[in-house]
C-alpha cells in the first residue's frame, strides 16, 4: 500500500510538471520533449547520483547536482524562465549587474555570458561558492565576473550560516553552522553603483536592504529583482515591511508580460512566482524592452 501511495504521489508530481511545460513559453510548443528531458536528467541526478555538465543558451556550461534549480536550464529552456527572459531583454553589454545570493551561478552566467554584463556575484556558503567558481571557470567571458565569498547584512562582521541545506542555506536562527564574514551593500557598492540587482537570500532580504540605504537612494540603480516568499518570517520580518522599504526608496512593484512586453503596476508582490520586479526608472527599463532575442538551446 505504501508503494502505491508513493507511486501515486510521484505520478501526480510528474503530471504537474508536464502541465507546467505546457504553459512555459520556452517548452509549450513541445511539452512532451521537455518532460522526457526532465525525466532523463533526474534519473542521472537522483538514481545514478551523478554530477552532470549541462550546456544551454548559446553554449553556456554549468555542472549540476540533484536539487539545483539551475537544472531547469536543461529541461525547461531556462531556469525561472519568466525572470530570465525579462533580464535577457533588459540587460546590455557593459551594464553593471550585482547578483546577491548567486548560488551556483544561474543569473551570474546569464547576465555575464548572454548579455555580457559586468557582474559581481556574492555567495556566502564556501561549498556553494566553490561550485559557482567552477561554473565561472568552465566558460569564456568578455568581462570576468568578480566573485565574493561573503554574506551581506545590515552591518559588517560575522554571521552563522547553515551549510547542510543544499541550495537553500541561509543565516542560521539556531546558531549552528559555519561562520561567514559579512559586509553591507553600501560597502560593496561604494566604488560603483550597479545598474541592476538580483537578491535571493532565503529570508534575509530586509537586513541586506537596510545595509544598503545609500545604494537604494542612488538614481543609477534602476531595478531590483527580489525573492519574496514569506521566508523572512524566520527572522520576524514580513514581506510587507520589505515592500514598504523599497517603495520608500522609489522602487515600485511591477509584473512584466512577456507576450505584450508591457509592465503592469501591482500594489504588493508578484504572487504567481517567488521573484518580484521593483523598478525605479520605468521609462529607462521600458526603453530596453522590445528587441528580439537570439536563442539557441
Predicted regions and their residues:
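S-adenosyl-L-methionine
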Residues: 1-125, 130-135, 139-144, 174, ...
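Short alpha-helix
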Residues: 182, 237-248
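Hydrophobic pocket-lining residues within nucleotide cofactor-binding pockets
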Residues: 150-152, 201, 228
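Short, conserved loop/helix-junction motifs that constitute active-site signature segments
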Residues: 111-114, 212-220, 246
